[in-house]
Regions:
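Bilobed "Venus flytrap"/periplasmic-binding protein-like clamshell domains
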Residues: 1, 52-119
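Extracytoplasmic/secreted envelope proteins and their assembly/folding machinery
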Residues: 5-8, 12, 26, 44, ...
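Sec-exported extracytoplasmic/periplasmic mature domains
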Residues: 12-16, 31, 76, 94-98, ...
Length: 239
C-alpha cells in the first residue's frame, strides 16, 4: 500500500484484516485529528509496537546541503501521499520554518526517490523506516550520500506536539560510508488488527510474536523490539 494512512483506512473499511502503521497516524485516526480531522477511523485495535522507525533525511554527499535549513528552495521527496513518512516530513519542515511554498515537495516512493537523488533530479528525500533500510544501503553502495541531523529544538517541538516521537540516534556505520552518528527522531511501527478478527486468532498471533521474536528477527531487515514495555510504548489507542 501507500503506507500508514492507507493501511488505517483499509482496516477501517474491512478491506484488510491486519496492517502496520506509524503510532502518530494511528492516534490521529483514532481521535479524528491531523490528516484524519474529517475522516475519523475505527474498527481496529493495536496488537503491539514492533520496532522504531527512524526519520532519515538523505542527500548527496557533495550537495552542499548540511542542515534542514539548507533545503530552502530545494526539490525534496517527502514520501508517498498518505504515508507516515509524508506526515513526519511535513511536520519537520514546518517546525523548521519551511512550508511547502519554500520547498518543492514531491511524493515519491523510496525506490524512485533514491534513483532520482542519484541522478540529480531531486536534492533530498525523507525515509521513515526501521534501520538498516535496504534502499538506503543500496544507494550508499552506488553513490556517496550523507544524512541530515534534526536539531534539538526541532525534536523537542515535535515531541511536545506528538508524544509518539522520541529522540533517536542512528549509530555510525549503520550504512556504507556513514562514519558519524546521526541525531534524529523515531516513531513506533505498530501492528494493527481488524475488530472482525476473532479473539482467538489475535491471541494466538500475539503469543506467536512474543515467543518467536528472536526467530522472526532473522527473517526481517529491521530491529524488532518485542517485550511487554516496548510493545505498548508510544501508542495510546486500545489493544
Amino acid at each position: 500500500t501507500a503506507g500508514s494512512a492507507a493501511n488505517i483506512r483499509l482496516l477501517s473499511k474491512n478491506y484488510i484484516e491486519m496492517g502496520i502503521a506509524q503510532a502518530d497516524l494511528i492516534n490521529d485516526a483514532y481521535n479524528g485529528t491531523g490528516i484524519f480531522v474529517s475522516t475519523q477511523c475505527s474498527g481496529y485495535k493495536a496488537i503491539a509496537a514492533l520496532y522504531p522507525e527512524a526519520c532519515q533525511i538523505v542527500v548527496h554527499n557533495d550537495s552542499g546541503i548540511n542542515s534542514i535549513d539548507d533545503l530552502l528552495g530545494k526539490k525534496v521527496s517527502i514520501g508517498e501521499s498518505n504515508s507516515g513518512t509524508e506526515q513526519t516530513a511535513n511536520l519537520i519542515l514546518q517546525l523548521n520554518g519551511l512550508s511547502d511554498k519554500l520547498v518543492d515537495t514531491l511524493n515519491y516512493d523510496y525506490t524512485t526517490a533514491a534513483g532520482k537523488l542519484q541522478s540529480g533530479e531531486i536534492d533530498a528525500f525523507f525515509c521513515t523506516a526501521g534501520l538498516r533500510t535496504t534502499i538506503i544501503e543500496e544507494l550508499a553502495q552506488q553513490c556517496p550520500i550523507k544524512f541530515l541531523s534534526i536539531s534539538d529544538s526541532c525534536s523537542k517541538k515535535l515531541e511536545s506536539a506528538y508524544d509518539t516521537y522520541v529522540d533517536y540516534t542512528i549509530p555510525a556505520n549503520t550504512y556504507t560510508g556513514q562514519t558519524e552518528e546521526i541525531k534524529t527522531v523515531a516513531v513506533q511501527a505498530v501492528l494493527l488488527a481488524s475488530n472482525e478478527l476473532s479473539d482467538i486468532v489475535v491471541e494466538s498471533l500475539t503469543e506467536f510474536l512474543f515467543e518467536h521474536s528472536a526467530d522472526l528477527q532473522y527473517s526481517v531487515p529491521v530491529n524488532l523490539q518485542l517485550d511487554e514495555t516496548s510493545a505498548v510504548y508510544g501508542n495510546s489507542n486500545p489493544y
